[in-house]
């Protein structure tokens, strides 16, 4: 605890916030002013962190879920002494190239744990971090991993649908080291929260198994005491802090306009006078800055003791900690997958079950792998020999998310951002839209999150068009920096998994059918991954110079091969190109792409989805065999015939263009 009055320490956050917003002419300043005491209590008395080692493995995590109030976080990081958050960064708030973006963007070296983006994502990210901590605490022991995850939460976060999902699941799993600090200012962009919300929020959390406390006004001592009580309770905690938005800004505090109205120099001068603040823009008195810097050094002794404990571990355990901290996979994981590819060659299996077999093999080699699905274990088979992660068993490696796809996706990102674990989430492709914010933010952050999907087309049959995701492949491929894999058989499944796990700069989606995948690759050679270039010639023309090129993914590769056989028998030299990952194919040089696509040939693409995106590969004279609208109910084989996704249809398209 500092010997400086904490009130002016909180006011330093206010001053830096209003100066940054006034300088740029915009910004959401109301939340930082209202939550300044909450943040001061947390960062000066409870949060365990070390700006000299920002990525300390056993640091507490802080997530600003209400990210529009980002200047609160930036001010805290500057005040506590993060080298990557100098005062000059705050002066460039909301400018191109600044680390101080309008909403926080992940920069662990500067203390920004995660890009929270849209409201609600951050609270689920925080739950994922708390889950990762609970598992690692079991795996490595409390002497190596034992920390809390805090989130600053606004009214909007709690109104989002994902909030209901994650409140329920976190309470069920008793994630006791998860603490949410609710900035309960009862104001949002449209005005009074009562216009849209009337439930008893405290009762809502208690009903879900949370520890709930309420703190009045801007009382630093009361907030600190509540945090201490939360840390001692085995349940996840909500601390409802009744605040005033824009506190300290004369004429605007408590008003709707305090959310984000434009500030003038007259406003900032009035705030300085109200707070008794000396100095010009961005000036923090030395005694107050020194007190904040001491707060930033508060955990130095704990950090040093932790470092000594790690150094004294037996060599094998010390190596494991180092590997997990660095995000490296164990030796032999790649060889395990390639061995599986050789075993899967020539074998038929339900597509998603190939992935389930692969995950079971990976889990045996990778102790940090955590699997899970939203009430779809029987349909996707990604649990197998794994046992459930529960409130009673923190060593379980399968998470039963319940029907909570949105929470699952955001929690996966939180786990990956936390580090030390390799989580995967499995669901039907039609539910991908519930995870879309997660994909987008993972891609933006460059997080290597792995998403697995099943039931990928009209091939699911009688469940009908509501569950036949004809448009979703195209929408996933539209997301920058995300790799979308649609393997054609067990060999390509193993190759896709290898590529997804090896990738460290962005997320991957692995997409499988419910129906069986027959073998399209008769063998898999050791050390060979044909999918690594995104697309490759699976079967070259054998009847002379190539005249036609058939392009396909997933289940439709087999249809293309059947069409090729008929065309070749009729004297049309035809090649089949499997395209498991468009994004990797786009990374290849022009010579390779042309050698695969052969632009001078007739090109026909085959995919049980909409055409969007295929024209870049088939060209202006090419054709597409697939879906042009939604599906319908019927047996899978009949549906393929009904919609004309057949070898005969492919042959007709080729002949029409020769």
What are these regions (language model features)?
Residues 3-4, 20-29, 57-65, 109-120, ...:
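A short glycine/serine-rich beta->alpha loop
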Residues 34-172, 383-384, 415, 522:
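Cofactor-binding active-site loop characterized by glycine-rich and histidine/acidic residues
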Residues 95-107, 125, 131, 135-146, ...:
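Thiamine diphosphate
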Residues 82-92, 170-183, 206-210, 442-457, ...:
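A glycine-rich helix N-cap at a beta->alpha junction
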Residues 10-26, 183-185:
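N-terminal capping segment at the start of a domain
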Residues 24, 60-61, 112-115, 142-160, ...:
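A short, small-residue-rich loop immediately preceding and capping a beta-strand
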Residues 57-58, 240-249, 253-331:
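Terminal amphipathic helices with adjacent charged low-complexity linkers/tails
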């Amino acid at each position: 605890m500092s010997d400086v009055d904490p009130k002016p320490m909180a006011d330093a956050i206010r001053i830096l916030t209003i100066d940054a917003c006034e300088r740029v002419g915009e910004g959401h300043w109301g939340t930082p002013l209202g939550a300044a005491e909450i943040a001061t209590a947390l960062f000066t008395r409870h949060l365990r962190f070390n700006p000299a080692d920002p990525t300390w493995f056993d640091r507490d995590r802080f997530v600003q879920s209400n990210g529009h109030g980002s200047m609160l976080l930036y001010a805290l990081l500057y005040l506590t002494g993060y080298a990557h958050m100098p005062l000059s960064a705050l002066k460039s708030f909301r400018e191109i190239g600044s680390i101080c973006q309008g909403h926080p963007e992940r920069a662990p070296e500067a203390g920004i744990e995660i890009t929270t983006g849209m409201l609600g994502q951050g609270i689920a990210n925080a739950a994922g971090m708390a889950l990762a901590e609970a598992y690692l605490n079991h795996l490595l022991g409390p002497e190596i991993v034992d920390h809390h995850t805090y989130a600053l939460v606004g009214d909007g976060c709690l109104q989002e649908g994902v909030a209901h999902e994650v409140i329920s699941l976190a309470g069920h799993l008793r994630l006791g080291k998860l603490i949410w600090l609710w900035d309960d200012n009862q104001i949002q962009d449209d005005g009074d929260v009562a216009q849209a919300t009337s439930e008893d929020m405290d009762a809502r959390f208690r009903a879900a198994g949370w520890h709930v406390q309420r703190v009045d006004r801007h009382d630093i001592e009361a907030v600190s005491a509540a945090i201490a009580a939360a840390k001692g309770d085995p349940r996840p905690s909500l601390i409802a802090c009744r605040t005033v938005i824009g506190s300290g800004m004369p004429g605007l505090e408590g008003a709707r306009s305090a959310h984000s109205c434009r500030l003038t120099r007259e406003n900032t001068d009035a705030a300085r006078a109200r707070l008794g603040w000396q100095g010009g823009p961005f000036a923090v008195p030395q005694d107050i800055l020194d007190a904040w810097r001491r707060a930033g050094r508060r955990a130095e002794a704990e950090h040093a003791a932790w470092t000594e404990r790690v150094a004294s571990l037996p060599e094998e355990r010390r190596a494991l900690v180092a590997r997990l901290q660095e995000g490296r996979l164990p030796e032999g994981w790649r060889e395990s997958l390639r061995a599986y590819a050789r075993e899967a060659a020539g074998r038929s299996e339900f597509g998603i079950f190939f992935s389930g077999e692969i995950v079971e093999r990976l889990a045996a080699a990778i102790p940090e792998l955590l699997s899970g699905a939203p009430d779809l274990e029987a349909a996707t088979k990604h649990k197998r020999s794994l046992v459930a992660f529960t409130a009673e068993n923190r060593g379980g490696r399968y998470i039963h998310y319940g029907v909570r796809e949105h929470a699952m996706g955001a929690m996966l990102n939180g786990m990956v951002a936390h580090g030390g674990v390799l989580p995967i989430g499995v669901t039907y492709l039609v539910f991908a839209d519930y995870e879309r914010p997660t994909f987008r933010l993972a891609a933006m952050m460059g997080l290597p999150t792995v998403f697995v999907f099943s039931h990928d087309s009209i091939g699911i049959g009688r469940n009908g068009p509501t569950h036949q995701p004809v448009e979703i492949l195209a929408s996933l491929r539209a997301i920058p920096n995300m790799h979308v894999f649609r393997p054609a058989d067990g060999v390509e499944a193993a190759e896709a998994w290898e590529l997804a796990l090896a990738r460290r700069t962005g997320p991957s989606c692995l997409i499988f059918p419910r129906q069986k995948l027959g073998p399209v690759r008769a063998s898999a050679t050791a050390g060979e991954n044909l999918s690594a270039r995104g697309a490759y010639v699976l079967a070259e023309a054998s009847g002379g110079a190539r005249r036609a090129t058939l392009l396909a993914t997933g289940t439709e590769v087999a249809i293309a091969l059947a069409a090729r056989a008929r065309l070749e028998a009729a004297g049309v030299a035809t090649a089949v190109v499997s395209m498991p990952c468009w994004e990797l194919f786009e990374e290849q040089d022009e010579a390779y792409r042309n050698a695969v696509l052969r632009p001078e040939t007739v090109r026909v693409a085959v995919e049980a989805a909409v055409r969007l995106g295929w024209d870049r590969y088939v060209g202006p004279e090419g054709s597409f065999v697939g879906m042009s609208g939604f599906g319908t109910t019927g047996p899978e084989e009949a549906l393929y015939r009904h919609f004309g996704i057949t070898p005969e249809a492919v042959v007709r398209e080729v002949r029409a263009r020769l």
